[in-house]
């Protein structure tokens, strides 16, 4: 059985690029993990490239602002790639189609600056799901009927 890896440094020399998750790795939602930032900065100082990856439904620029607010060191990474960035690319490619956005208003920056036509679910060509409309009171079960309608279409 493999042992526990307590530090990245012993492995670092075998890699040129590090894809590093954000939540739970470089921060805990309240503050940055200083040791993680230090390790990533050392990797970069030795010539490595660090790409932060996240499933946050926001563009990388918005994620960067959040990381700044949490105290994540900017010298700990080279770039950020988010599911929001990937979503924007898909929406841009489908600009002639109508979209239904299933998600809270705080996730609307996904669409900022894009030529997008929003439509009700019944007439939309596709759905972008970034979360629940209100995750303070809803659960996935709240969407059973809506998801069934999507499946039928």
Regions found by a protein language model. Give the residues of each.
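HAD-like aspartate-dependent phosphatase fold
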Residues: 1-153
């Amino acid at each position: 059985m493999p042992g526990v890896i307590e530090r990245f440094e012993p492995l670092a020399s075998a890699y040129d690029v590090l894809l590093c998750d954000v939540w739970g790795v470089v921060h805990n939602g309240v503050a940055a993990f200083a040791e993680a930032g230090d390790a990533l900065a050392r990797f970069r100082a030795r010539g490595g490239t660090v790409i932060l990856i996240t499933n946050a439904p926001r563009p990388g620029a918005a994620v960067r602002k959040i990381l700044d607010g949490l105290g994540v060191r900017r010298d700990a990474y080279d770039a950020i790639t988010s599911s929001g960035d990937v979503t924007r690319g898909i929406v841009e490619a489908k600009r002639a189609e109508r979209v239904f956005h299933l998600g809270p208003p705080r996730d609307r920056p996904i669409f900022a600056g894009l030529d997008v036509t929003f439509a009700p679910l019944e007439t939309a060509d596709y759905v972008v799901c970034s979360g629940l409309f209100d995750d303070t009171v809803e659960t996935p079960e709240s969407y059973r009927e809506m998801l069934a309608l999507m499946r039928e279409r």
